[in-house]
Amino acid sequence: MENLFELHADVRVEQGKGASRRLRRAGKVPAVLYGAAKEPISLLFDHNLLFRHLSHDAFYSHILTIHANGKAERVVLKALQRDPVNPNKVLHLDLQRVSSTQKLTIKVPLHFIGDEMAPGVKQEGGTVARLLNDIEISCLAKDLPEYIEVDLADLGVGETVHLSDLKLPGGVEIPALKLGEDYDQPVVTIHKPRAAAEEEDTGAEGDVEAADAE
């Protein structure tokens, strides 16, 4: 995957909650960089510059280059904390170093295609219900995809695409599937048209009333 994002950071010297509050008021975002058998480093990012990157969906699933203390580190975003009152305010970042020899676990977005061509929509008038927007995958950095494609072109009413149905790029795995069938989550399904569903409900109610009358 092409590296599209480069960020510059300062090494953080001040520690503690009080220092964090002062730094945030000064327009800085505290962060921690860890992994790859190296010591964790506390960093500071400029909030406004960081927020511009966060407006791109690809930022969350790409390998990022962080320049700090005269060195460049390849990392992925592992956690992002926002202000619960003001979501446009970023409070903290967790960044993990990327190793060329160790698999990383990261969430990537799902891209749905073929909605309009799906028999359940085009011929049967059903409604697409997306149950997941992203999934957690495991792979080497060189195999990291920007997204996973979900093709609905052959999906009918009442049919569901599960995690195990997804076509994954080479070298990519879904860790949840190793835990058993109970973890094979539904990804997307096509519901019956509302009128048909209401007719079925009405018919079921009529059957119950007839049975009660007997």
Swiss-Prot record:
GO CC annotation terms, alphabetical: cytosolic large ribosomal subunit
Family per record: Belongs to the bacterial ribosomal protein bL25 family. CTC subfamily.
SUPFAM superfamilies found in the cross-reference section: Ribosomal protein L25-like
Region described as Disordered: spans on this chain: 193-214
Residue spans crossing the bilayer: none
UniProt keyword GTP-binding, yes or no: no
UniProt keyword terms in alphabetical order: Ribonucleoprotein, Ribosomal protein, RNA-binding, rRNA-binding
Any GO BP annotation: translation
Pfam families named among the record's database cross-references: Ribosomal_L25p (PF01386), Ribosomal_TL5_C (PF14693)
InterPro entries: Rbsml_bL25/Gln-tRNA_synth_N (IPR020056), Ribosomal_bL25/Gln-tRNA_synth (IPR011035), Ribosomal_bL25_b-dom (IPR020057), Ribosomal_bL25_C (IPR037121), Ribosomal_bL25_long (IPR001021), Ribosomal_L25_dom (IPR029751), Ribosomal_uL5_bac-type (IPR020930)
Coiled coil stretches, renumbered: none
Role description: This is one of the proteins that binds to the 5S RNA in the ribosome where it forms part of the central protuberance.
Keyword rRNA-binding: yes
Subunit relationships: Part of the 50S ribosomal subunit; part of the 5S rRNA/L5/L18/L25 subcomplex. Contacts the 5S rRNA. Binds to the 5S rRNA independently of L5 and L18.
Name this protein carries in UniProt: Large ribosomal subunit protein bL25
Domain of life assignment: Bacteria
Biased composition (Acidic residues): 198-214
Gene expressing this chain: rplY
Gene Ontology MF annotations: 5S rRNA binding; structural constituent of ribosome
